[in-house]
Amino acid sequence: MKRVFNLIVVDESGSMCVIEKQALAGLNETIQTVKKVQDAHPDMEQHITIMTFDSGHKRYIYDNVLAKDATMLSKKDYNPGGATPLYDAVGIAISRLNAITTDDDHVLVTIITDGEENCSTEYSLNMIKTLIEKLKKHNWTFSFIGTDNLDVESMAKEMNIDNHLTFTEDAEGTAEMFATERVCRMSFMHNIFAGHAIGKGSYFNSDNNDDKKH
């Protein structure tokens, strides 16, 4: 049986409070999308990991749970505050998942942030880019999603991430971003099921989005 691991690393720093409600709704919609994929392709086992992070914590809301066992999140699960240890969160999350996956598995990593790295102590940029470049050779696909106050393309490139998406940090922009991501995730999953190769930098390439700003 094919196994697909969905890892979502979400910024929970203080500035995300502007879109707190929409971010929570978007995460729930993403969970629903993965569950729908599981229902559509029962012989392709879907796993979900969601980590949120700020300067006070790197917390797993879900830690490698089967999609069928995942339930919707509530307000208590997402409460923005603190600074942005982006490299630590990404490094910890992908290293932990790497320890339990094999080369036969597919891993889709989604990183969502509205701020730049500012307080990591365990992982440096060089460590992250080296780790990501290594994992990309073993059926790992990475996407980096950031707000329009950031140079999202440059941040993604610095980490060796080929897929990037910029969105406006307001209710409408956040909702549109998650809608785009869901379409792309569904397409990605169908391609895996069909045995199609996943092209470099192709995750967000669809009629719905070509790395457009929302």
List each language-model region with its residue ranges.
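Acidic, low-complexity intrinsically disordered regions
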Residues: M1-H214
